Swiss-Prot record:
Belongs to the PsbH family. SUPFAM superfamilies: Photosystem II 10 kDa phosphoprotein PsbH (SSF161025). One of its GO terms (molecular function) is phosphate ion binding. Keywords: Chloroplast, Membrane, Phosphoprotein, Photosynthesis, Photosystem II, Plastid, Thylakoid, Transmembrane, Transmembrane helix. The modification Phosphothreonine is found at T3, T5. The keyword Chloroplast applies. It is found in: Plastid, Chloroplast thylakoid membrane. This is Photosystem II reaction center protein H. It comes from Piper cenocladum (Ant piper). One of the components of the core complex of photosystem II (PSII), required for its stability and/or assembly. PSII is a light-driven water:plastoquinone oxidoreductase that uses light energy to abstract electrons from H(2)O, generating O(2) and a proton gradient subsequently used for ATP formation. It consists of a core antenna complex that captures photons, and an electron transfer chain that converts photonic excitation into a charge separation. One of its GO terms (biological process) is protein stabilization. Signal peptide: none annotated. The gene is psbH. It is a single-pass membrane protein. GO terms for cellular component: chloroplast thylakoid membrane; photosystem II.
Length: 73
């Protein structure tokens, strides 16, 4: 026949590991959402600062910002 059945004896359930036991508490709050805005404003500030940082790096890379005392070849 073209099909073959697999015995269910190979399915022994999830295997417990030391790493899994250590990481289990981190997943205990899965699916729960804190009421209100939470840390959203903090994340917005972090994203804005990161965008400013990236724009400064881009301007330095493009030599559009002149830095005194630093020679650019």
């Amino acid at each position: 026949m073209a099909t073959q059945t697999v015995e269910d004896s190979s399915k022994s359930g999830p295997r417990r590991t030391v790493i899994g036991d250590l990481l289990k508490p981190l997943n205990s709050e899965y699916g729960k959402v804190a009421p209100g805005w939470g840390t959203t404003p903090l994340m917005g500030v972090a994203m804005a600062l990161f965008a400013i940082f990236l724009s400064i790096i881009l301007e330095i890379y493009n030599s559009s910002v002149l830095l005194d005392g630093i020679l650019v070849s």
